[in-house]
Structure formats: C-alpha cells, structure tokens
Amino acid sequence: MPELWQLEEQIYAEGFRLICGVDEAGRGPLAGPVCAAAVILPRGLEIPGLDDSKKLTEKKREALFEPVKAAAISWGIAFAQVDEIEELNILGASFLAMNRAIEQLNPAPELALIDGNRNSGINFASRCVVKGDSRCADIAAASVLAKVTRDRYMLEMAELYPQYAFERHKGYGTKQHYEAVSYTHLRAHETLRH
C-alpha cells in the first residue's frame, strides 16, 4: 500500500499537517441517495487490503469497514437524499453530502482531497484528485466507508420495497430495475434507456 501514500506525502511536504480524503457512492444509480465519506488516516498508516472500493468485492469492503473506522483519526459519513438530488442535481447533491461528511471531522482537516475532477461546491480548502480512490489512502478509505454505508442503506430499502430487488443491485440500473420502474417514478429523469 505505500504507493497509496505517495501523493499524500507530497502534500504533507508542502506543510499541511492534517488532510482528509473524500469520496461518494451513489452518483450513478437510478434509485436511492448519494452517500459521502470523509476520512483522516494517521500519516503513512497501512491498512492491509485497502484500495478503491470499486476494485474490492462486497465481502472485502465489509471486512475493511470497521478497521478503517477504528484506525482513522476521524471519519464522517453523510447522505443527500433523493429530494435533495432532484432539487440540486446529482453533482450538487454530491457536494452537499461531501460537505456534511467533512463537517463531522474533529479535528478539522487543513485540506480535503476530493475524488474526481470537480470541487467547486466544496466549502473547505480542497484539491481534486482524479482517480483518487486508487491513488490516495485517505480517499480509498472514504470510498470504502461511503460504498458500504450506501449499500447497507439500500439493503434496508429492499425490505421496504421488495418489488425493486435493491438487495441485488443497490439501485444501479439493471434490466430488472428498468422493468420494475414505471414512468410515474421518473420525475427528474424523463428519458430512461436500457
């Protein structure tokens, strides 16, 4: 995992003492909220198996969830719900969830590393890191917390709405999901293709 710390070490060398990684889960699905996490790991800490959550199996993500939280100096997890997504759009709602997650951190970071190429909606000192979840340990840790938390939420929704089989796809578009969604559910997304 040392390669996961290379970029962060360069940032620490600039004089920063406390940085966090921020990532989200749920920007692509057709259903459910967007979930963001912010994590401050101790500098240079290696967590065996830590990587971009998309590269890990569900079982490996679940196995990393508690160790990441236990090892972190601080962590925060927050949602932007469907009504906020519809009001703000998915990017605005992602920023909202990220800001909420960063606000939970104590101590507060001096710099937030945001996965992706946009940070205009972040209310804190921040930098974008494209593919940050596979390049930065703090962002990789945040990606695991966000993905596991959102998946668990969608499992709860599966119990309330069994007709959508959220336990199988977590709200991401599948043929079964498209078939279960009627035109009356599409308010903000008028065109649905499959």
Residue spans of the language-model regions?
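RNase H-like, Mg2+-dependent phosphodiesterase core
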Residues: 1-187
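A short, hydrophobic C-terminal helix/tail in secreted or cell-surface proteins
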Residues: 188-194
